Amino acid sequence: MNFGFIIYIIGWLLNFQGAFLLVPCIVAMSYGERSGFAFLISSVISIIIGMICTRKKPKNRSFYAKEGFVAVALGWIVFSISGALPFIISGEIPDVFNALFETISGYTTTGATILSDVESLSKCLLFWRSFTHWIGGMGVLVFMLSILPLAGGNNMHILRAESPGPSVGKLVPRLRSTATILYAIYAALTFIEFVLLLLGGMSLFDAVTTAFATAGTGGFGIKNSSMAEYSMYIQNVVGIFMVLFGVNFAIYFLLLIKKPKEALKSEELKAYFGIILVSTVVIGFNIKDSFSSIWVALQQAFFQVGSIITTTGFSTVDFNTWPALSKTIIVILMFIGAC
């Protein structure tokens, strides 16, 4: 086991974390919040430890599957601990375990929260919660691979360990280019959603945090009512992008290189959209008596189906009040997941 090189990778991870932690400081300054100092302190701690770990390149750069899994496992642990520091230092979530829970939920895009009143948090911490979704949605080590050739030709071991699916492959011969393409698509979709939300009348802060939470399919909301208080236009934009972020990014790559026929031949994509369509129609007609029209019922059904099948977790209604058939479909969709 090449522990020296693993520590080197963890060090770079902390350096990146230090940079990420500085972003909410901008939000804090914009709103005049003292919690911004918590991010500044956390950033300095992360960067100092990161610089210590990376001050000397290890001579032994051999890196195999076992090192890849260990690096990813340790990376997520270190990232979660350092990411929880702002909650603890600011005193807004003083309990260590609660702060860790909130941070881990963010990075893993689980979306579960210990907060009963989300709106009581400062803006910079609300931003950080959503930002952890965006960072974790694609995987921070994938982001690192797109910038740094850390493990030379053995980067694939990191990518395989980082990816949650049964298999992962290269989009192009160079793995670093693959990681760059993945993040470029991810960032582009996030930006498009952000712009559409702004056009719908959302505030700049709400649009950024909602786009981050949607992209990571995590669903950390900044309102206690989740998405219920927003307009139907906003809900539709978020619903569509939840579904789009659930699509295998390899399909988007095929569209980018002008191979739409090959992309549309994907059995995975057909099954994904087919399940969403059928579930939306069945639930929509099943709940139509609870809404003003069938179109509103279908819109609400589509939003909840998209939210559940992609495991995002945003909500616009209390679907626990829906008929048994609709609730059964919702539960089944939880186990299916997206592409």
PLM region descriptions:
Residues 1-339:
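Membrane-proximal intracellular helices of multi-pass ion channels
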